[in-house]
């Protein structure tokens, strides 16, 4: 008897096979696309912001503070791209197409 049929037999119903991954699925891509003119603009927008966040972390040891750090509370070991996508989703950034 498989584990799925065993769970059904026990009356528990179907259980998810895995946890929902974080990152690109949170915030949802459809909601992010509402904030830009195209998926390509979203890629460029988020990549530029992720690079700024990465440069911010790299310069902390030098004491220069030329770049702006994360505008949302970063999670433990959260990647700069995930932080940038959360900032875009929260409308914390201003973006002009073509820049």
From Swiss-Prot:
Subunit: The RNAP catalytic core consists of 2 alpha, 1 beta, 1 beta' and 1 omega subunit. When a sigma factor is associated with the core the holoenzyme is formed, which can initiate transcription.
HAMAP family attached to this UniProt entry: RNApol_bact_RpoZ
The entry's keywords: DNA-directed RNA polymerase, Nucleotidyltransferase, Transcription, Transferase
Enzyme Commission designation: 2.7.7.6
Classification via SMART domains: RNA_pol_Rpb6
Any GO molecular function: DNA binding
Keyword Nucleotidyltransferase: yes
Encoding gene, per UniProt annotation: rpoZ
Pfam family, one: RNA_pol_Rpb6
Role according to the record: Promotes RNA polymerase assembly. Latches the N- and C-terminal regions of the beta' subunit thereby facilitating its interaction with the beta and alpha subunits.
Keyword Nucleotidyltransferase recorded: yes
Sequence similarity: Belongs to the RNA polymerase subunit omega family.
Region feature Disordered, mapped onto this chain: 1-20
GO CC field: DNA-directed RNA polymerase complex
Catalytic activity: RNA(n) + a ribonucleoside 5'-triphosphate = RNA(n+1) + diphosphate
InterPro entries named among the record's database cross-references: DNA-dir_RNA_pol_omega, Pol_omega/Rpo6/RPB6, RPB6/omega-like_sf
Provenance organism: Rhodococcus erythropolis (strain PR4 / NBRC 100887)
Protein name as catalogued: DNA-directed RNA polymerase subunit omega
GO biological process: DNA-templated transcription
Biased composition (Low complexity): 1-10
EC supergroup of this enzyme: transferase
